[in-house]
């Protein structure tokens, strides 16, 4: 216990006791001010109750002065103890007074009928002060009234009656046995620490966070997909990725740019009987063949090859120029032809049918590559390969150079042995993903995602298609938890999974820093409507963008509030005051209130339900999660957090 907390607990108690002990006898001094017998009697009785009333007033003043303090609960306990002591002093004094003539009381009357009314009044005041102090000690700053307009519901709600989803209803919607952690079932804005800023290194600012029941999603309604928006440093990994990785029981694919999640949850998932694989460029010996799923489970090889080529080639959700479209489309066709030659022509051994071989065949000098294309056209056993190669056999050198440069640029990351090893290995196969027992953590850092986005697209796309081609024939569901998903760029396969993934056992949980990231990736303002329409739930937290705050405010709806108006008029004959009430429209939450939300608070939208305002499930606040989590390689660099947590 710190010195401040000791002072907050001891000082009000000592002050209240001191006043209760020092003021008795003041009734004679007060009575001397009376001019008549009645006045002296009244002032004397006021003096009898004054020590206890003054003690109660001191306690209340102390609580009001400490309002907003981190240790307000400690002050509440101190005032409650002081009130108890004052009541005890009053009872002892009155008991001693009554004991002096207890033997003279008639048998028909009770000794309690002689209790002094003034003392009873003072004691009752101290009792009420103690009850309020106990309320403060239990719920902290939430015990004080909040300044907000009176909301109107029912027939008088002319401007709307939007309201927050009630927590019991939220508990039914997001049952605790679900696998995707959405948040915690408590209202941060009504918590004891609502007036304080959230600090991860100060447990006294956490309030009910970490002690409340979880809100979890089981994929039972909607598309089963979720989208999370939280700014940089907004505890995305802490409150979404790690808790979900601890709780999800099925196949889990995590895009982990910080390589932070896998070391923390790997041991827990292995204990749960899961096979955990970490794809890390620093360990290229662990990898899979990104082409091993082609043509399996009813899919055509030609379509699957075209899909792989499209992941390697970067694509934008926005319209581009005709020249750019031509060279991109031609480069895509050339890459498709080379991949098809490796997989379909029949001259490449099965074990060598990898993207590394594709890059080796493609990265030849132009004259040699043109000769290879002619040879492929003449000798390939596949009509599909011949038809795709035919366009390049007699292409003019200038045009072919542009197409060749485009294809080389998009596949240059395959020249890095550590990157090529991840998608050309044999440690596991994509069939393992669909078996329902394997988890994969894709630990590509932000620099790699920014420079070589095709690598992540190939990995995620291969896993998605391996499940998609099975037509839903897999145990349970596979969760693709994609942190920093904007770094993947535009992926049409994600749009396919968004629209039809539920049928095939695919659930997406995508984490963005802002709505702007989504719009930039998927093509302007229409992107939000496409993705929001297909999401079962959408979470917003740690918002710093006024435009996003305005969107949240509008989506939450409006309420009807009652406003008191007072008008005064002054005339020669006197003055008058008129008081009236009127109804006005007010947003359920205003944009500036969204921007001022605590970092551990979020707003969750679901289709057909009121917006949910709740807490966030940060793993370091929950004892059940802390016991399962391994070491975080970043916490040692953050100072107080790893000492307090």
Q: Which role does the model predict for each range below?
A:
Residues 131, 183, 346, 456, ...:
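Glycine-centered flexibility motif
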Residues 132-181, 186-193, 304, 310-312, ...:
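Short alpha-helical interface patches
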Residues 189-215, 317-326, 347-348, 563-582:
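Low-complexity, polar-biased intrinsically disordered regions enriched in Pro/Ser/Thr/Gly
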Residues 209-210, 217-223, 227-506, 584, ...:
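P-loop NTPase motor domains
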Residues 82-85, 498-500, 504-603:
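Conserved ATP-driven motor cores of ASCE-family P-loop NTPases powering translocation/secretion/packaging/pilus
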Residues 2-14, 18-241, 582, 644:
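Basic- and hydrophobic-enriched, low-structure N-terminal and domain-boundary segments
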């Amino acid at each position: 216990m710190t010195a401040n907390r000791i002072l907050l607990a001891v000082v009000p108690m000592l002050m209240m006791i001191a006043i209760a002990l020092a003021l008795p006898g003041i009734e004679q001094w007060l009575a001397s001010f009376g001019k008549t017998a009645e006045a002296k009697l009244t002032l004397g009785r006021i003096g009898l109750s004054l020590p206890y009333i003054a003690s109660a007033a001191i306690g209340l003043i102390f609580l009001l002065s400490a309002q907003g303090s981190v240790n307000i609960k400690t002050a509440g306990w101190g005032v409650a103890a002081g009130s108890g002591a004052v009541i005890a002093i009053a009872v002892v004094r009155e008991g001693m007074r009554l004991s002096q003539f207890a033997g003279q009381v008639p048998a028909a009357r009770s000794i309690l009928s002689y209790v002094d009314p003034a003392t009873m009044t003072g004691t009752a005041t101290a009792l009420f002060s103690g009850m309020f102090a106990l309320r403060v000690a239990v719920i902290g700053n939430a015990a004080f009234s909040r300044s907000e307009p009176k909301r109107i519901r029912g027939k008088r709600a002319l401007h709307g009656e939007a309201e927050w989803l009630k927590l019991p209803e939220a508990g039914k919607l997001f049952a605790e046995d679900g696998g995707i952690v959405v948040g915690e079932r408590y209202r941060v804005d009504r918590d004891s620490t609502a007036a304080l800023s959230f600090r991860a290194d100060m447990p006294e600012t956490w309030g009910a966070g970490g002690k409340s029941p979880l809100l979890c999603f089981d994929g039972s309604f909607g598309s089963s997909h979720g989208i999370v928006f939280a700014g940089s440093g907004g505890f995305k990994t802490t409150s979404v990725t790690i808790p979900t990785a601890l709780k999800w029981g099925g196949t889990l694919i995590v895009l982990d740019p910080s390589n932070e999640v896998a070391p923390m949850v790997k041991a827990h998932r292995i204990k749960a009987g899961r096979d955990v694989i970490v794809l890390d460029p620093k360990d290229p010996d662990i990898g899979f063949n990104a082409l091993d799923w082609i043509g399996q489970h009813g899919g055509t090889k030609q379509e699957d090859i075209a899909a792989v080529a499209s992941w390697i080639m970067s694509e934008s959700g926005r319209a581009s120029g005709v020249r750019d479209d031509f060279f991109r489309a031609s480069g895509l066709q050339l890459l498709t032809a080379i991949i098809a030659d490796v997989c379909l022509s029949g001259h490449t051994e099965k074990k060598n049918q990898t993207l590394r071989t594709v890059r080796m065949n493609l990265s030849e000098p132009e004259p040699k590559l043109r000769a290879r294309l002619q040879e492929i056209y003449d000798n390939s056993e596949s009509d599909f390969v011949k038809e795709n190669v035919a366009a390049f056999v007699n292409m003019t050198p200038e045009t072919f150079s542009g197409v060749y440069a485009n294809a080389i640029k998009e596949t240059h990351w395959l020249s890095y042995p550590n990157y090529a090893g991840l998608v050309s290995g044999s440690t596991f196969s994509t069939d393992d993903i669909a078996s329902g027992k394997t988890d994969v953590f894709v630990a590509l850092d932000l620099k790699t995602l920014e420079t070589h986005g095709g690598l992540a697209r190939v990995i995620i796309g291969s896993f998605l298609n391996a499940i998609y081609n099975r037509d839903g024939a897999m145990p349970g569901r596979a969760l693709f938890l994609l942190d920093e998903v904007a770094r993947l760029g535009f992926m049409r396969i994600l749009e396919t999974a968004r629209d039809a993934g539920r049928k095939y056992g695919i659930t997406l949980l995508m984490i963005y820093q802002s709505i702007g990231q989504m719009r930039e990736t998927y093509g302007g303002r229409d992107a939000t409507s496409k993705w929001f329409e297909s999401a079962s739930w959408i979470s917003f937290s740690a918002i710093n963008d006024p435009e996003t705050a305005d969107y949240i405010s509008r989506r939450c709806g409006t309420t009807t509030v009652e406003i008191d108006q007072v008008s005064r008029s002054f005339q020669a004959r006197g003055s008058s005051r008129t008081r009236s009430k009127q109804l006005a429209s007010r947003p359920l939450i205003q944009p500036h209130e969204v921007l001022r939300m605590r970092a551990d608070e979020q707003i969750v939208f679901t289709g057909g339900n009121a917006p949910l305002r709740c807490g966030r499930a940060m793993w370091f606040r929950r004892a059940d999660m802390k016991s399962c989590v391994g070491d975080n390689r970043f916490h040692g660099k953050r100072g107080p957090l790893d000492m307090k947590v």
